[in-house]
Amino acid sequence: MYRHACYLYIISQGGELLSVAIIKEWPSVFITSLAASTMKRRHCKLNSLPQELFDKIVEYLSLSDYCNLVLVCKRPSSKYNVIFDSTNHQHLKGVYKKTDVQITSYNEYINCICNELRQDEFYAKSSWIASICGHQRATIFSVTNKQVEMKYHLYNIAIVESEDCNGFYPFEPTRDCLICKQKNQCPRNSFIVSLCKYLEKQNVQSNFIYYLYEINT
């Protein structure tokens, strides 16, 4: 979701978007002053932008800058009011409710028929059973806080590594949530996306803490 150190300069008139510039060099605190100065202008107020455009702006902000924006505009994004992050942010506590989420993980082969192949006389003595099987090694994640798991549909999450070992993706990327029948709108999806990015950065322990940020609405 969030692209760190990227900021938007927006020019609009009469509700029509005229120009958007993505600027990387400005310090994080600039987004607060930009929001404050923009709100003072008669015809260009961030808190009066169409919701779709406001949500689009939030996509380019880090969690810290998003919280600054909420603090200034008194307006959260309808799309990103539930955020999962591996970083323990300890500032702007009035903007969000933070919950520590204990996560356990283990590895498992998916779509594996190695045992069946070993029972076949033709393959039993083969040293290439794993290659013939073509199974995938997945990391299965479980949330120990059952209240959080049920509220945000964080059940049975399996993530696999890409064949070129350059990234991770959900084992069933096109599957809708079985509870709410949604995909992109379900917090489960943002949790999976965040976990994939987390896996790319470091080796995951069997037990670790993640953080749930519920933005005040």
UniProtKB/Swiss-Prot annotation:
Q: Which domain of life is it from?
A: Viruses
Where does the record place the F-box domain? 43-92
One Pfam family, please name it.
F-box-like
**Coiled-coil region(s) at which residues?**
none
Q: What is this protein called?
A: Uncharacterized 14.2 kDa protein in PK1-LEF1 intergenic region
What species was this sequence derived from? Autographa californica nuclear polyhedrosis virus (AcMNPV)
